[in-house]
């Protein structure tokens, strides 16, 4: 059975685990570097990117996760995970993995009280819109030449792919729609 690691330090990791199970794969909660070994893909959940970055450093996960993605294994970051995957973060020196050639702006849609849901058109997932749950969501402000823009909302880039790396500003794990998780799991050889 396909094992998918889910960084389980803070944030919506349980919801991602349920989504991975619903897609027929086995979720593995990652809290230590050795737990990555058998995983064929990794999800970095939403939560608070600064806190997750500090916890990754404290648990010696930064380099193993960076290596995991640099070796070409699939990594999917949602919300805070998008921020952590970015090469650059506007007005911030916070810890990041720097795996994707993107620049992001944190909290681009406002504060917690400004959280919202919207229908998002994601052509690679078909004609039916995706329900996007935005909670203090980032957005991408610049992409490198190897980055494909998969979706935007209000002219802000919210879903990108670079090879086997996927980053989204919203929380697909908080909905019953598994299309984005299935799309990501198809990255696995």
Curated annotation (Swiss-Prot):
| Keywords (A to Z) from UniProt | Glutamine amidotransferase, Hydrolase, Lyase, Pyridoxal phosphate
Annotated EC: 4.3.3.6, 3.5.1.2
Catalytic center residues:
79 (nucleophile), 171 (charge relay system), 173 (charge relay system)
Is this entry keyworded 4Fe-4S? no
Pathway named in the protein's UniProt entry: Cofactor biosynthesis; pyridoxal 5'-phosphate biosynthesis
**InterPro entries, sorted:** Class_I_gatase-like (IPR029062), PdxT/SNO (IPR002161), PdxT/SNO_CS (IPR021196)
GO molecular function terms attached to this record: glutaminase activity; pyridoxal 5'-phosphate synthase (glutamine hydrolysing) activity
Name any Gene Ontology BP term: pyridoxal phosphate biosynthetic process
Matches recorded under Gene3D superfamilies:
3.40.50.880
Any one GO CC term of this protein is: glutaminase complex
**Which Pfam family would be a valid example here?**
SNO
The record's listing under SUPFAM superfamilies reads: Class I glutamine amidotransferase-like (SSF52317)
The record lists its disulfide bonds as: none
Per its record, the protein catalyses: aldehydo-D-ribose 5-phosphate + D-glyceraldehyde 3-phosphate + L-glutamine = pyridoxal 5'-phosphate + L-glutamate + phosphate + 3 H2O + H(+); L-glutamine + H2O = L-glutamate + NH4(+)
For binding L-glutamine, which residues are annotated in this chain's numbering? 47-49, 106, 135-136
- Task performed by this protein: Catalyzes the hydrolysis of glutamine to glutamate and ammonia as part of the biosynthesis of pyridoxal 5'-phosphate. The resulting ammonia molecule is channeled to the active site of PdxS.
List the PANTHER family. PYRIDOXAL 5'-PHOSPHATE SYNTHASE SUBUNIT SNO, PYRIDOXAL 5'-PHOSPHATE SYNTHASE SUBUNIT SNO1-RELATED
Quaternary organization: In the presence of PdxS, forms a dodecamer of heterodimers. Only shows activity in the heterodimer.
Which family does the record assign?
Belongs to the glutaminase PdxT/SNO family.
Q: Which HAMAP family match?
A: PdxT
Name the record gives this protein: Pyridoxal 5'-phosphate synthase subunit PdxT
| Top-level taxonomy | Bacteria, Bacillati, Bacillota, Clostridia, Thermoanaerobacterales
């Amino acid at each position: 059975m396909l094992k998918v690691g889910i960084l389980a330090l803070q944030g919506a990791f349980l919801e991602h685990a349920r989504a991975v199970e619903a897609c027929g794969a086995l979720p593995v909660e990652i809290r230590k570097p050795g737990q990555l070994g058998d995983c064929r893909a990794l999800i970095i959940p939403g939560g608070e990117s600064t806190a997750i970055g500090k916890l990754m450093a404290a648990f010696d996960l930064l380099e193993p996760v960076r290596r995991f993605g640099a070796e070409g294994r699939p990594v999917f970051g949602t919300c805070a995970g998008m921020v952590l995957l970015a090469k650059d973060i506007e007005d911030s020196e916070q810890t990041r993995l720097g795996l994707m050639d993107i620049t992001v702006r944190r909290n681009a849609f406002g504060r917690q009280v400004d959280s919202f849901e919207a229908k998002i058109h994601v052509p690679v997932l078909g004609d039916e819109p995706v329900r996007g749950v935005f909670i203090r969501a980032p957005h991408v402000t610049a992409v490198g030449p190897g980055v494909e823009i998969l979706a935007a909302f209000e002219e802000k880039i919210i879903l990108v792919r670079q090879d086997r790396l996927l980053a989204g500003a919203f929380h697909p794990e908080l909905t019953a729609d598994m299309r984005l998780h299935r799309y990501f799991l198809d990255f696995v050889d």
